[in-house]
Amino acid sequence: LQKGAVTANRNVAVPQCAYSTVIQLRDWLPDAVGGVCWFGMDNPGQSPRVPIFCGTTDLPEMFKICGNHRYRLDAALWHYRQANKLATVRWGNARKILEKNLLHFERKGVEELTMVEQRYAELLKSQGEEAAKAYLTDYTKDCIGATLLRWDEMTAKYWNDYRFGF
């Protein structure tokens, strides 16, 4: 970059972020399983990233609803945002819980990736592309469901912990 080309700096993880992605492309695997969008809603520093494979054909309805313009619990964004905002208010107390949950899903994603690739290959060979993509879709939906549930549990815990004040 030329001097002066960048005049403003911004952290990647900011509270007003709607979503973040990390794109993983592995050309030695079939496209359907080799391309993964690790997708996180809300603040990238506080939200889990779920794997959305190139072969994923559908997402939960909550992921199809924009929650950026108003509070709405039919949008997945708010299930993450509530816990994240409450954690931010009392970061010193909430940080350990939130980071433990983030690390859990990060490890789960890394540890299960090879298993997903192998199962995809088995299904592709034995039942065809449609069954293999259905597996990826179900796996993605399961990951999303697990993170939504965990963030809802954190929201309830934080509200209980802070019920007498922040």
Can you say where each PLM-predicted feature lies in the sequence?
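C-terminus-biased signal that marks the final domain/tail of proteins
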Residues: L1-F166
